[in-house]
Amino acid sequence: MVRDKVTRAITGLLTACIMIAWVGGQAKGLGDIFAVFTGADPIPIIMLFNVVFIIYTYLGGIYSVVWTDFLQGIIVVIFAFIFYGYALAPVNFSMAVLQQKLAEVGAAELGTLSNVPVGTIMKNFVTGCFGILAAQIYWQRCFAAKDSSTARTGMLISGIAAVVFVSLTAIVGIVTRAVNPNLADPNQAMPWLMLNYVPTWVLAVVYTLILAAAMSSADSNLNAASIILVNDLIRPFAPDKTDQELVKYAQWLTIIVGVFSSLAAIYSSSIIGLFSKAYTMAGGGIVPVLLVGLLWKKTGEPFTMGTRNSRITPWGARLGIIVGSVISLSSLGILWGVAISAVVTIVVSLVTPDVPATEGPSAKV
């Protein structure tokens, strides 16, 4: 929407942060699980899995990523329901029983939303919604689909599946609190339940599938991050680079992103906290500018595919993204960040010049 290389670079960095958070989160989750099962220090395990992720992605590409996701995804879904069956058995698959057990351990507030402020619910919803909109891995698959109907159906199915499995996983965490209120580390809730309530054969299969799912998700995100950085940070500023050179840059960037993912996993307090910061930073800055660009069109000009009809100027986009990201990460939160980002984008665009029409299409965002 903006013919500006600087805006494109800022956007690339922010969206890459989401991928870094996802890769780091996968490694941190595996480290926490392994720590519960073996009692080992999770940090070396986190580093080991990140090295495996890097090598796996470095040697492959998007084609292998897609087929890996598809085949492993089918197996993961089947055994996920088996795992959830055992995980929810301690409360007899009943929300009423769960609520009763929570009340017995003094955690009844976990079974209801009545004590959660509306502002907190809205903030978490916007963080997740806008963060997903800024995640390149979903756009990558949409653009790779054979037509718009396939892309729309695929996103709808994956969205429904995400809601179901995330909800079930959250319930598993609440069940763990009900049956073991003295668990010190909340990050180890699911591994503890697996170790104590799931049969050994199911545990072995589920752990293997968790590793497979982590590999699948991590290589997708590493691949996406390297593509983002090549297309948005290197290609606009070095248009004469050959495809072979760009592929080489992507391979090196896979390693660099993997290193940053390891650091993020080691120093983050929790997986949710890691995701939340990345989603807040990217969603609070990029998505408001995207929405303004889609809605605020030049009057009197018919829409033409492949051309820019938005009234956003380069400086409007730059400042809107930066201000939105900074405010979203501050104590004001993402709701204020989104609103202020949109206002800044419009106001600055009204008082700054537009990009020259002679600039080539390679600089479009």
Which residue stretches match the model-derived regions?
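Membrane-embedded helix-loop-helix hairpins and adjacent transmembrane boundary segments
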Residues: M1-V365
